[in-house]
């Protein structure tokens, strides 16, 4: 399958939103019950890197980073968001997208990437492991689902982390 990975632009938001909504609908991608508006999403994610993967000109997936803390000492520590549209899952797009995000993050001086993943999302856990993330532990009953068939249920989250061998090594 031919695809291209490039920086996300505000004009991509409608398609990014659609992919995000597909992830939400699985019940195993996020605690979010709905896609936030552009302004809220934009303000909660780093300006760079933000990536989209396009197949035949349409957004098939996206990845972005957000800060884990406003404290200066954690300036290079981020949380990963990565979503692939359902028709494109299992075809290597997530693999290429996460590799590109890691590369871009290291160029931006990010030294640690974290991911919080529901234990049921085995494909995401395996994808992150493939790219050097390790399991730090399980955050037990960290939040309650507010929607879907798991509404009202406490959920565990697998906390994973990748420490760069390039950025922040001084």
Question: Which functions belong to the PLM regions below?
Answer:
Residues 58-62, 123, 154:
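Glycine-rich acetyl-CoA-binding "A-motif" of GNAT/NAT acetyltransferases
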Residues 105-117:
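Conserved GNAT acetyl-CoA-binding A-motif
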Residues 13, 17-43:
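Conserved GNAT-fold acetyl-CoA-binding loop/helix
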Residues 2-16:
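A short beta-loop-alpha structural element at the N-terminal edge
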